[in-house]
């Protein structure tokens, strides 16, 4: 405890500059400051040199699952068919360990020319504009007008348009109603009371190894924040300063909310899940596949991944749920799901910009990519994907429900790797301790606050 008090007394760290303009504050109005900043930065950027007449080789990297890998590779082949002098060499893998790999590349100046990035990487690896090119310098080759100002503003850091958003995303509940029906429940949960009643019904009617919902450690943190925002109507932290908006007592209440879900048999304890599955994602678990876990709180873009993972006895029950209103306010946030950026070490930025434009804006590329990276944020890309029937209905339904409901802003430090990393992050430490040690919110709040301060949050 003395260490925590010492840090709280003496380490008052200013937060990173945030993404003003991404969303309105909980229940508030949108901020045009970042959009105007984006416009002013665009006016002062010198354009890059033109296209090369010689053969060009580009490199590109991304993370994802098999269907995303296939979509990118097919789109790259189509791009090279139209631009025969440009060869694109891809590097891709699953998410696990990917950020560590890319952070090393960014630090060494050896990252690929075009990179799929997480939004917070702009702050983690290019807070001063040192890593990614200002895309205002390639507007002859990349049509930035296809994105709304607010979406572009979310990716404008250090007065530079460092990436374009591929899609916007947020969390929503997916349910397996086949299992719910077996427990005598015919409607998707829409309130906290519904969740608690489902936990009791599952245990009594189906047995101790059936649960209405599963939450991993990071999922628990996101739902905890969703709950607090729903109750108190304020962002988790100020998006421009990363100053925490919640008191220690309020955060302890949020942690105890998660504990109540474990105690009420709504969610499986983490020790029980790890015992069966290790660090495997929920959609890979036997419990999800066979319907013993009947709900998940996930990114909207994951809808088809979770639906397709169900076995034949359960597939028909997959349902995109509704956001649950835990209080008087609409909690939850949306964010840039991922962006495409050009590294400053790229020797052919004009061609790299053409590749991004092809993938996200042009009919051929956007129709191949479809919704593999979420519902397209580009207006032209969305129209092309829809015309080709390439936007998956489940993903579109989930995304629409998220965007219609959530009202809070995300700050750029929330997803810091030291906080959310599987196995080693602060969020994992907090929620593992909750289950393994029988701790309470009051016991664990300092652990969470210490971890947040360590990555740059200002904690009162």
Placement of each model-derived feature along the sequence:
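Mature extracytoplasmic/periplasmic domains
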Residues: 131-132, 137, 302-304, 338-418, ...
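Extracytoplasmic/periplasmic substrate-recognition and gating elements
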Residues: 81-82, 87-89, 183, 263-267, ...
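Hinge/lid segment of periplasmic solute-binding proteins
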Residues: 42-50, 119-170, 319-323, 393
């Amino acid at each position: 405890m003395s260490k925590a008090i010492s840090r709280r007394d003496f380490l008052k760290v200013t937060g990173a500059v945030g993404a003003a303009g991404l969303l309105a504050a909980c229940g508030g109005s949108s901020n045009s400051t970042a959009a105007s900043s984006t416009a002013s930065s665009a006016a002062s950027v010198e354009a890059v040199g033109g296209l090369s007449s010689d053969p060009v080789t580009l490199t590109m990297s991304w993370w994802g699952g098999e269907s995303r890998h296939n979509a990118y590779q097919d789109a790259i082949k189509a791009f090279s068919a139209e631009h025969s002098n440009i060869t694109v060499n891809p590097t891709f893998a699953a998410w696990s360990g990917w950020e560590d790999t890319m952070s090393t590349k960014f630090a060494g100046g050896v990252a690929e020319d075009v990179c799929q990035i997480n939004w917070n990487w702009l702050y983690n690896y290019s807070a001063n504009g040192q890593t990614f090119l200002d895309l205002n310098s390639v507007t002859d080759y990349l049509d930035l007008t296809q994105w709304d100002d607010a979406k572009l503003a979310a990716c404008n850091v250090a007065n530079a348009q460092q990436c374009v958003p591929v899609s916007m995303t947020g969390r929503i509940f997916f349910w397996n109603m086949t299992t719910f029906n077996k427990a005598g429940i015919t409607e998707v949960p829409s309130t906290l009371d519904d969740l608690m009643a489902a936990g009791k019904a599952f245990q009594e009617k189906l047995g101790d190894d059936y649960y209405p919902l599963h939450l991993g450690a990071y999922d628990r943190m996101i739902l905890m924040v969703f709950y607090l925002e729903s109750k108190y109507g304020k962002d988790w932290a100020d998006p421009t300063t990363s100053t925490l908006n919640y008191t220690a007592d309020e955060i302890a209440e949020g942690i105890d909310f998660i504990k109540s879900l474990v105690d009420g048999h709504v969610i499986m304890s983490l020790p029980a899940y790890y015992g069966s599955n290790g660090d495997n994602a929920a959609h890979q678990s036997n419990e999800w596949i066979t319907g013993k876990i009947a709900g998940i709180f996930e990114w909207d873009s994951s809808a088809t991944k979770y639906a397709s993972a169900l076995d034949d006895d359960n597939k028909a029950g997959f349902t995109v749920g509704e956001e649950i209103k835990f209080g008087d306010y609409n909690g939850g946030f949306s964010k840039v799901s991922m962006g495409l950026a050009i590294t400053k070490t790229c020797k052919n930025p004009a061609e790299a910009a053409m590749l991004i434009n092809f993938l996200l804006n042009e009919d051929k590329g956007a129709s191949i990519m479809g919704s593999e990276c979420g519902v397209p944020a580009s207006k032209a890309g969305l129209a092309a994907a829809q015309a080709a029937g390439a936007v998956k209905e489940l993903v579109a339904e989930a995304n629409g429900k998220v965007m219609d409901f959530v009202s809070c802003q995300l700050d750029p430090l929330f997803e810091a790797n030291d906080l959310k990393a599987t196995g080693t992050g602060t969020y994992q430490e907090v929620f593992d301790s909750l289950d393994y040690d029988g701790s309470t919110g009051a016991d664990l709040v300092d652990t969470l606050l210490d971890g947040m301060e360590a990555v740059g949050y200002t904690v009162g």
